Amino acid sequence: MSSGRIVQIIGAVIDVEFPRDLVPNVYDALKVQGAETTLEVQQQLGDGIVRTIAMGSTEGLKRGLDVVNTGTGISVPVGKQTLGRIMDVLGNPIDEAGPIGEEERWTIHRAAPSYSEQAGGNELLETGIKVIDLVCPFAKGGKVGLFGGAGVGKTVNMMELIRNIAMEHSGYSVFAGVGERTREGNDFYHEMKDSNVLDKVALVYGQMNEPPGNRLRVALTGLTMAEKFRDEGRDVLLFVDNIYRYTLAGTEVSALLGRMPSAVGYQPTLAEEMGVLQERITSTKNGSITSVQAVYVPADDLTDPSPATTFAHLDATVVLSRDIASLGIYPAVDPLDSTSRQLDPLVIGQEHYDTARGVQYVLQRYKELKDIIAILGMDELSEQDKQLVSRARKIQRFLSQPFFVAEVFTGSPGKYVPLKETIRGFSGILNGDYDHLPEQAFYMVGSIDEAIEKAKKL
């Protein structure tokens, strides 16, 4: 336990001088004496001076204060005691419900599992959300990205996924709120409480108003808790909202440390930082981590370096579209843009594959015909195309679904649709079994039987 003293403070960056033979390692956690602040070593500048990032506010700190090296990285509580609790980046409880009472703490910087320990699998994870199960099915132990601009429903989709998976699969989840709104974190906590699934979720928050150090490390804190559950032999879910803010915090820290920026002002280590996080989110022979990550897309530009770097790591991408949201179709998932590695007849079966591809073909053809319809009207289309357009509009509406977590806003009860029902409904529409029903009957219903019932009332 060596000690040093603060020699410089610039915002969240603090330089600390140690005896030359006792300089802390990079990523060691330092504690400021007489303050609650923890610092993390980022660079060794020479002459016994290390440059650190503060994991919290630097208000009230001054030069000359004593700093103690803990000798290890930041460590956080892991295990069942974390379930139902809200913690910050350092693992301290922030829900005013007393100490965590953990039996074990792990450091947040860990090596990814080796090749020999990793395990692949093709088992599907049913979500109960029609458009996702049909067009971009999730793999157990896979990584999923929810891509979308501001206000198209990333967080609502994520809340619905957590609720459905906790209720239907009774697994443990870890939710890392990275640089998002505190109000959303609060809503999320109460939503989980009302759904009676809070005792299966560990919550870690580093919200928008916190210093960049907190936002950069909070994803690792959540991941460490998930790794513990995985190593105990469980199938655990890790939700990260929002991975873009993780990148953004990295950009801020990089600038504070004086590194040269790269494209669009991002940090030069963008790919490496993303890789360090993503490579740890993997399944081993003991258990699996299935990860769902919300990805904010700046200015709806998917070629921005941050979403583009994230794409490379994912097994499935769910793209939320502003155009679909503007039609009032929620979840606003774009079935033509969203993809999954699992969409393979050898994995999901021929019937599911044919139905998904059939739906995509009909919607793509409808998209092509829209220009003709806009200029010449429906009457100029062939009978075959008229029929296709009618089915496409039904499919488009049938892809919508009332959510449990949005009941308060929509006034209609949420629906969980099993995969078999989803396939039956869409293949029926493609085969023309429901050509006689009006398209309004398919809007905001669960299974196809509900659409038939709704049609009787129209």
Curated annotation (Swiss-Prot):
ATP binds at G148, G149, A150, G151, V152, G153, K154, T155. It is a peripheral membrane protein. It is found in: Cell inner membrane. InterPro entries: AAA+_ATPase, ATP-synt_VA_C, ATP_synth_F1_bsu, ATPase_a/bsu_AS, ATPase_alpha/beta_chains, ATPase_F1/V1/A1_a/bsu_N, ATPase_F1/V1/A1_a/bsu_N_sf, ATPase_F1/V1/A1_a/bsu_nucl-bd. Keywords: ATP synthesis, ATP-binding, Cell inner membrane, Cell membrane, CF(1), Hydrogen ion transport, Ion transport, Membrane, Nucleotide-binding, Translocase, Transport. GO terms for molecular function: ATP binding; ATP hydrolysis activity; proton-transporting ATP synthase activity, rotational mechanism. It catalyses: ATP + H2O + 4 H(+)(in) = ADP + phosphate + 5 H(+)(out). GO terms for cellular component: plasma membrane; proton-transporting ATP synthase complex. Its EC number is 7.1.2.2. SUPFAM superfamilies: C-terminal domain of alpha and beta subunits of F1 ATP synthase, N-terminal domain of alpha and beta subunits of F1 ATP synthase, P-loop containing nucleoside triphosphate hydrolases. F-type ATPases have 2 components, CF(1) - the catalytic core - and CF(0) - the membrane proton channel. CF(1) has five subunits: alpha(3), beta(3), gamma(1), delta(1), epsilon(1). CF(0) has three main subunits: a(1), b(2) and c(9-12). The alpha and beta chains form an alternating ring which encloses part of the gamma chain. CF(1) is attached to CF(0) by a central stalk formed by the gamma and epsilon chains, while a peripheral stalk is formed by the delta and b chains. Produces ATP from ADP in the presence of a proton gradient across the membrane. The catalytic sites are hosted primarily by the beta subunits. Belongs to the ATPase alpha/beta chains family. NCBIfam families: atpD. This is ATP synthase subunit beta. The lineage of its organism: Bacteria, Pseudomonadati, Pseudomonadota, Gammaproteobacteria, Pseudomonadales. The gene is atpD.
